[in-house]
């Protein structure tokens, strides 16, 4: 049984190599036309568009003050005073401060946490 399996494997390998050589020689002799993809233009790489500057900064992005951050409860957290500032999560009080002082990116409503409310 093993000998039969080895013999079939060898015959199959010889067949694969011989058919590959036929295709290569026919292609070199221009007997076969190269396959053209009719949808190649559809998948062509498009030129990247320049990113426009956003009016607000997402979480983890650079900021100058709380009004630069997008989320209602986001605050501008700075290391070493005013250096390495980025938007991080704040709280309800942050939202109220932003509502009072920010003219752009002003929160419409401030979400309240349901953790402290007693249900009953």
Curated annotation (Swiss-Prot):
Expressed by the venom gland. Its main location: secreted. Residues 1-16 form the signal peptide. Disulfide bonds join 56-70, 63-76, 69-87, 78-85. Residues 56-95 form the Agouti domain. Belongs to the neurotoxin 05 (agouti) family. The presence of a 'disulfide through disulfide kOR' structurally defines this protein as a knottin. This is U13-lycotoxin-Ls1e.
């Amino acid at each position: 049984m093993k000998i039969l399996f080895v013999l079939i494997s060898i015959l199959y390998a010889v067949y694969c190599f011989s058919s590959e050589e036929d295709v290569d020689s026919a292609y070199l002799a221009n007997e076969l036309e190269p396959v053209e993809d009719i949808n190649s233009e559809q998948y062509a790489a498009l030129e990247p568009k320049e990113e426009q500057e956003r009016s607000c900064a997402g979480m983890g992005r650079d900021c100058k003050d709380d009004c630069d951050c997008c989320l209602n409860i986001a605050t501008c957290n700075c290391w070493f005073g005013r250096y390495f500032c980025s938007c991080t999560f704040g709280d309800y009080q942050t939202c109220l401060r932003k509502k009072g002082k920010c003219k752009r990116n002003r929160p419409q409503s401030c979400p309240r946490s349901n953790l402290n409310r007693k249900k009953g």
